Swiss-Prot record:
The gene is tgtA. It comes from Sulfolobus acidocaldarius (strain ATCC 33909 / DSM 639 / JCM 8929 / NBRC 15157 / NCIMB 11770). InterPro entries: ArchSynthase1/Queuine_TRR, TGT-like_sf, TgtA, tRNA_ribo_trans-like. This is tRNA-guanine(15) transglycosylase. Belongs to the archaeosine tRNA-ribosyltransferase family. One of its GO terms (biological process) is tRNA wobble guanine modification.
Length: 498
């Protein structure tokens, strides 16, 4: 059925899903390149050649400059997935447009896109909360106003309910809850983040995405308007964003800005292209610089599209392998703004753990690096698991080991005692589960970060204080904890050493 969304794979709060549309199945995460119906610097055929199977265009501009009231697929000579925006971006840019919500929604029903957006009122980055509240209420009102058109076209079009609120997280929460309750709309979208992304202000964007996603149904696909920089895709996907749209690829190209997955260069800065796409394999930066302006813009735009496509594919592969946390950890160090985004997303580690699958198909290694790895779902989940394990003996044996071989050779230590392995990042791991996932599959540096050691000592203190052991033995922990081995000692002796 049109609008059905099936989740195929999950990692953190991200997912690979299949959205059913009239013109085929859309696999998410997915990017919708913005097509300008008036300018043809990049053709739809160019976009298809890069590998995209979904585009977005502006119904307001179609109405204003083309005016045809017929199937937009025919107008554009395009038979794949098509989304229409309504003119809200023009409101954000120019303050108002000469068309009503009812007019544009009615026009969209005649264009018959696969996915369509009502004419909402963007909040933008206004500092006037009254204005922000007005934009939220107006958007909610317009969604209700459009319901009769939505109902009549629901078998052909997936309608999107925008979420507004700008920088006011309480308004975003309210807007998200109301949007989610309106069952006429099968897709949701966060509006107004474009300016933040243009400024590389990713940390507040993380807050906005979290606040909206944590207050809507998991089963509805979620769109991020204006999400066009490879910098931010992985962080947004980790929080549960499914689709993006942007004209960034062409806007950057007009300014001779060359995207990579880590940063943006100006063409004149480059002696070599750090890319092997068909454009960069054929030309050098000098070649492109010497081309006529129109050709130069076209080639940079095509390259930018290849980079966006590559990033989306890399995110999907990381998600499929259960390595999305490691990937955003890696992305964090590509730019100070992504580092801020990563630090901000760690504030929501419990939310990420909530949706992260406990077990995936093929077991992969768990790579642990520094104190940021303490926020991984596997590590957070261990604390809950440990709290459920009951004390069975009066004696406790703690063992530190750098080896994945059997860490306890001396079975005498194990008699009549509860036995735990002291494992950096996790804390105390029951011996009988040490050889299971994720503990045995965890890979970590031979020299452990001092913040991780500090955390490990605190976890050990907490573990000891929550139980009533009479004696404790600690073995082989000189290197990790800087504590000499002791056997059968009072618990307070170890606590004093920690």
């Amino acid at each position: 059925m049109i609008g059905d969304f099936e989740i195929k794979d999950e990692d953190l709060a991200g997912r690979i899903g299949i959205l059913e549309t009239k013109h085929g199945k859309l696999e998410t995460p997915a990017f919708f390149p913005v097509i300008n119906p008036v300018k043809n610097e990049i053709t739809i055929q160019d976009i298809l050649s890069v590998g995209f199977e979904s585009i977005i265009t502006n119904a307001f501009l179609i109405k204003k400059y083309i005016g045809k009231e017929e199937d937009l697929h025919s107008i554009l000579n395009y038979n794949k997935i098509l989304m229409t925006d309504s003119g809200a971006y023009q409101i954000l840019q120019y303050g108002d447009i000469d068309v009503s919500n009812v007019d544009i929604v009615n026009y969209e029903t005649k264009l018959k896109p696969d996915i369509a957006v009502i004419l909402d009122i963007p909040t933008g980055l206004t500092e006037d909360k009254k204005e922000a509240e007005k934009s939220v209420e107006s958007t909610i009102s317009r969604a209700k106003e459009a319901s009769k058109f939505v109902e009549l076209s629901k078998d052909e079009i997936i309608w999107v309910h925008p979420i507004q609120g700008g920088m006011y997280l309480d308004l975003i929460e309210y807007s998200a809850r109301i949007a989610d309750m309106n069952q006429d709309y099968k897709m949701l979208a966060l509006g107004s983040p474009t300016v933040l992304m243009q400024r590389y202000e990713y940390a507040p964007l993380i807050d906005m995405i979290y606040k909206s996603k944590s207050n809507v149904s998991r089963g509805k696909p979620f769109h991020l308007f204006g999400g066009g920089h490879p910098h931010i895709f992985a962080f947004a996907v980790a929080l549960g964003v499914d689709t993006f749209d942007s004209a960034s690829y062409i806007l950057y190209a007009r300014d001779h800005r060359y995207m990579t997955r880590e940063r943006v260069y100006r063409l004149e800065e480059l002696d070599y292209f750090p890319c092997s796409c068909p454009i960069c394999s054929r030309y050098s930066p000098k070649d492109v610089m010497e081309m006529p302006e129109e050709q130069k813009v076209r080639l940079i735009a095509l390259h930018n599209l290849y980079v966006i496509k590559e990033e989306i594919n890399y995110i999907k592969q990381s998600l499929k392998e259960g390595r999305l946390f490691e990937y955003i950890q890696q992305k964090a160090y590509s730019h100070p703004s992504t580092f801020e985004a990563f630090r901000r997303i760690l504030n929501y580690s419990k939310y990420l753990e909530k949706y992260d699958p406990r077990v995936k198909g093929e077991v992969k290694g768990v790579f642990l690096f520094d104190n940021s790895s303490l926020h991984r779902p596997e590590v957070i989940r261990h604390a809950y698991t440990l709290s459920k394990i009951k004390q069975r003996s009066k004696a406790l044996v703690l063992y530190c080991s750098d080896s994945k071989d059997n860490p306890l050779k001396n079975t005498e230590d194990m008699k009549n005692a509860d036995v735990y392995i002291v494992l950096p990042f996790y804390g105390c791991v029951p011996y009988n589960v040490f050889f299971t996932y994720p503990y045995f599959q965890s890979e970590m540096p031979s020299t452990i970060d001092k913040d991780v050691i500090y955390d490990l000592k605190n976890k050990l203190k907490e573990f000891l204080s929550q139980r009533s052991y009479e004696t404790v033995s600690i073995i082989g922990c000189e290197k990790i904890l800087h504590v000499d081995s002791i056997r059968g000692a009072p618990v307070n002796l170890l606590l004093n050493k920690l």
